[in-house]
Amino acid sequence: MSRLNYAFLLVTLLPQISDAAAVEDEVSYLLGVVDNSDCRFVRNDISYSNEEFQQHLMSKWQQNEELISSAEDFIEKIATRSSISGSPYVALCGGELQIVKDWFIGLLESHRRSNH
């Protein structure tokens, strides 16, 4: 393969690799916050520990990886609601209920601000 072909491949593939790494970094950050939280998470009217909920989201992400091209996709397609019932995921943190989607959006925005 000529140098020109290598250069072309490099120029076309690097942004995709970089984007995929950024998505993985941001999603891993969100999952880490869940894992390190003292929150309880409700899905389909059942309460789960932070570890159980994090494992659920990781499993759901792995099963649907091809649908996720951004952290926003992860939030909307994986971490927002039950794929079975359509019910939103809810977090109980420090006595306050919050919708997981809203919590994750706030966390993501804060994470991006602190990294730029």
Segments predicted by a language model, with ranges:
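Aromatic-patch recognition
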Residues: 16, 24, 30-32, 104, ...
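Bacterial N-terminal signal peptides that target proteins for export
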Residues: 1-6
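Compact alpha-helical subdomains of small soluble proteins
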Residues: 44-116
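N-terminal secretory signal peptides
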Residues: 20-60
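Bacterial N-terminal signal peptides
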Residues: 7-16
